[in-house]
């Protein structure tokens, strides 16, 4: 990958041997390795048995999970917050695992719509809950830095499964909870 980054530098008219750019190909490689580390992650290994029998029936919500990803169309970042909730079906998951699941899918080349669905589906497959709700609000640098150059636009996406999709009361509770004091 480093040779390719060096070639990009040459193609845009830069000197890859210039003092400030000598280590850039290696730095970019390391950055992309980290930013795309979700391809190498395994959800079952990540959860690592942190699923517990519990008879609770109330909604479980982790709100305002900071996330960032790379737009697959321009390789530019998008960033924002994810809100992830589920209704337990005799099982709960360690709460730190939910942001980790968000990171697994965010650390891939993405579109926000698919990212939202993948997070919801992973929670559904891992826990078999009565329902899952995921909402992501993000700013896309591909819209801010190029193209339409809209600095204040935000994209909202949602994925609703089970009770979140079929039961208006569950859906309303979820949306009310993420609105209250949300960033």
UniProtKB/Swiss-Prot annotation:
Pfam families per UniProt: GTP_cyclohydroI (PF01227)
Domain of life assignment: Bacteria
Gene Ontology process terms (BP): one-carbon metabolic process; tetrahydrobiopterin biosynthetic process; tetrahydrofolate biosynthetic process
Enzyme Commission code(s) on record: 3.5.4.16
PROSITE patterns the UniProt entry points to: GTP_CYCLOHYDROL_1_1 (PS00859), GTP_CYCLOHYDROL_1_2 (PS00860)
This protein's GO CC annotations: cytoplasm
Keywords on record: GTP-binding, Hydrolase, Metal-binding, Nucleotide-binding, One-carbon metabolism, Zinc
Enzyme class: hydrolase
Keyword check for Cell inner membrane: no
InterPro entries per the UniProt record, alphabetical: GTP-CH-I_C/QueF, GTP-CH-I_N, GTP_CycHdrlase_I, GTP_CycHdrlase_I_CS, GTP_CycHdrlase_I_dom
The reaction(s) this protein catalyses: GTP + H2O = 7,8-dihydroneopterin 3'-triphosphate + formate + H(+)
Known pathway: Cofactor biosynthesis; 7,8-dihydroneopterin triphosphate biosynthesis; 7,8-dihydroneopterin triphosphate from GTP: step 1/1
GO MF terms, alphabetically ordered: GTP binding; GTP cyclohydrolase I activity; zinc ion binding
Family the UniProt entry places it in: Belongs to the GTP cyclohydrolase I family.
Subunit structure: Homomer.
Protein name (record): GTP cyclohydrolase 1
Organism: Leptospira biflexa serovar Patoc (strain Patoc 1 / ATCC 23582 / Paris)
């Amino acid at each position: 990958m480093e040779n390719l980054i060096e070639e990009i530098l040459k193609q845009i008219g830069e000197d890859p041997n210039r003092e400030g750019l000598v280590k850039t190909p290696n730095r970019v490689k390391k950055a992309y390795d980290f930013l795309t580390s979700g391809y190498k992650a395994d959800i079952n290994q990540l959860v690592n048995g942190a699923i517990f029998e519990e008879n609770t029936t109330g909604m479980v919500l982790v709100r305002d999970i900071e996330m960032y990803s790379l737009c697959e169309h321009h390789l530019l970042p998008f960033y924002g917050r994810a809100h992830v909730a589920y209704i337990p079906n005799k099982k709960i998951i360690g709460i730190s695992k939910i942001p980790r699941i968000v990171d697994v899918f965010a650390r891939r080349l993405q579109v926000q719509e698919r990212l939202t669905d993948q997070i919801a589906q992973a929670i559904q497959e891992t826990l078999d809950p009565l329902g899952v709700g995921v909402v992501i609000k993000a700013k896309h640098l591909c819209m801010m830095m190029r193209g339409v150059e809209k600095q204040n636009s935000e994209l909202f996406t949602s994925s609703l499964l089970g009770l979140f999709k079929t039961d208006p009361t569950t859906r309303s509770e979820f949306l009310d909870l993420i609105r209250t004091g949300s960033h």
